[in-house]
């Protein structure tokens, strides 16, 4: 009997938390922080914190507040690869999407068509910001700096010894054909990027979510 009561209480608590999260999303304003999904952050699974970058009627654009993991843009050498074909996009829309979000949360995520310079348009549920989006939402370098979770650092994510800030990928390719752009620890964008196979740069996922559900 006690086990049944405990189970009921847990279900009620989970439902309450879910309602609170849904309400926070529905009331989200640009610049605010919300929680959505869960991911390993160094001490087990923890709610993912997101910064609201944009709000358009019934949907909002979220960017993870912290860099959550460290991954290469593309795992094998291929100078012709763009965001459309890279392994990082496959991981974000596959393993990450399926493990970080519940069925209810996935139902809120809006699949969008992303345009990326010098790359085919893509249909994404989870993605990285493009250089154009970075410039639109973060006009000054100081606002672009980010911390990485303990887990991301443990996976090899690079951080500055001076500031502790991380280097994080964008989905836009750099001038060399075998390189992709990333945001440096100081918020500047290295126009030459780095090798797409580099596994020291971190990942800040972005999602559009329905805020009227």
Where are these regions (language model features)?
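Sec-dependent N-terminal signal peptides of Gram-positive bacterial secreted proteins and lipoproteins
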Residues: 4-22
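Collagenous Gly-X-Y triple-helix signature in extracellular proteins
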Residues: 23-213
């Amino acid at each position: 009997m006690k086990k049944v009561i405990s189970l009921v209480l847990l279900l009620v608590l989970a439902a309450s938390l879910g309602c609170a999260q849904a309400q926070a999303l529905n009331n989200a304003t640009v610049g605010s922080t919300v929680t959505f999904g869960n991911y390993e952050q160094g001490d087990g699974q923890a709610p993912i914190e997101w910064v609201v970058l944009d709000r358009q009627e019934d949907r909002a654009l979220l960017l993870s507040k912290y860099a959550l993991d460290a991954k290469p843009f593309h795992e094998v050498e291929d100078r012709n690869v763009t965001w459309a074909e890279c392994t990082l996009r496959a991981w974000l829309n596959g393993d990450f999407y399926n493990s970080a979000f519940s069925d209810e949360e996935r139902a809120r995520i809006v699949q969008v068509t992303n345009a990326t310079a010098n790359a085919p348009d893509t249909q994404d549920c989870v993605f990285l910001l493009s250089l154009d989006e970075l410039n639109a939402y973060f006009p000054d370098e100081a606002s672009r700096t980010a911390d990485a979770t303990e887990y991301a650092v443990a996976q090899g994510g690079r951080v500055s010894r001076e500031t502790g800030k991380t280097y994080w990928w964008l989905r836009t390719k750099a001038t060399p054909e075998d390189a992709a752009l990333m945001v440096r620890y100081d918020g500047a964008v290295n126009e030459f990027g780095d090798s797409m196979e580099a596994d020291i740069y971190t990942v800040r996922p972005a999602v559009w979510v329905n805020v009227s559900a």
